[in-house]
Amino acid sequence: MKGGKIVQLTRPNRINSEIRAIKVRLTGVEGDQIGIVNLREALKKSEELGLDLVEISPNAEPPVCRIMDYGKFLYEKSKSSKEQKKKQKVIHIKEIKFRPGTDEGDYQVKLRNLIRFLEDGDKAKITLRFRGREMAHQKIGVDVLNRVKNDLIELATVEYFPSKIEGRQMIMILAPKKK
């Protein structure tokens, strides 16, 4: 065979004959402390039970080893990590753009969308854009942001409220209230 590679599996824990310590601190199947024993004795005990000797903490002095079924241990570990991933909620920031002259109908539609975003558990970013002469009437922009804030007071908390205009826009960030 030409140019073949030998792929060595790297396990997170050393098992059975891979353990290099002379003496180990041994724990039983149920987690009960057996004590500090010779590696040969520990391997013998694990073979008698038909299980594996797994090095749990290699940096300890002496290394901690446990008698267990290694395949079952890996399965349980992957299962618990999958469960943790399921429980994590990714929070997205949804953006809605307003203008100082946004009419009532458009305002209600945008407010409905904001309510939907917040109920889904996402943060909402309200961007208020100014064009041309609207820059002279920044008070109207602040009034629009205050109106949005007051309309959503039961659903959201204000994470960031602009103190002044940034460029040609003002940005307010809302986070959903915890239930």
UniProtKB/Swiss-Prot annotation:
Where in or outside the cell? Cytoplasm
| Role description | IF-3 binds to the 30S ribosomal subunit and shifts the equilibrium between 70S ribosomes and their 50S and 30S subunits in favor of the free subunits, thus enhancing the availability of 30S subunits on which protein synthesis initiation begins.
Task: Give the UniProt family note.
Answer: Belongs to the IF-3 family.
Listed under subunit, the entry gives: Monomer.
Gene Ontology MF terms in the entry: ribosome binding; translation initiation factor activity
The record's listing under SUPFAM superfamilies reads:
Translation initiation factor IF3, C-terminal domain, Translation initiation factor IF3, N-terminal domain
Question: Which NCBIfam families does this one have?
Answer: infC (TIGR00168)
Q: Which organism is it from?
A: Buchnera aphidicola subsp. Acyrthosiphon pisum (strain APS) (Acyrthosiphon pisum symbiotic bacterium)
Which biological process terms from the Gene Ontology are attached to this UniProt entry?
ribosome disassembly
Is NADP given among the entry's keywords? no
Q: Where is this site: Important for 30S binding?
A: Y107, K110
* The keyword Plastid appears for this protein: no
Sorted alphabetically, the Gene Ontology cellular component annotations on this record are:
cytosol; membrane
Name of the molecule in the record:
Translation initiation factor IF-3
| Cross-referenced Pfam families | IF3_C (PF00707), IF3_N (PF05198)
For this UniProt record, the keywords arranged alphabetically read as follows: Cytoplasm, Initiation factor, Protein biosynthesis
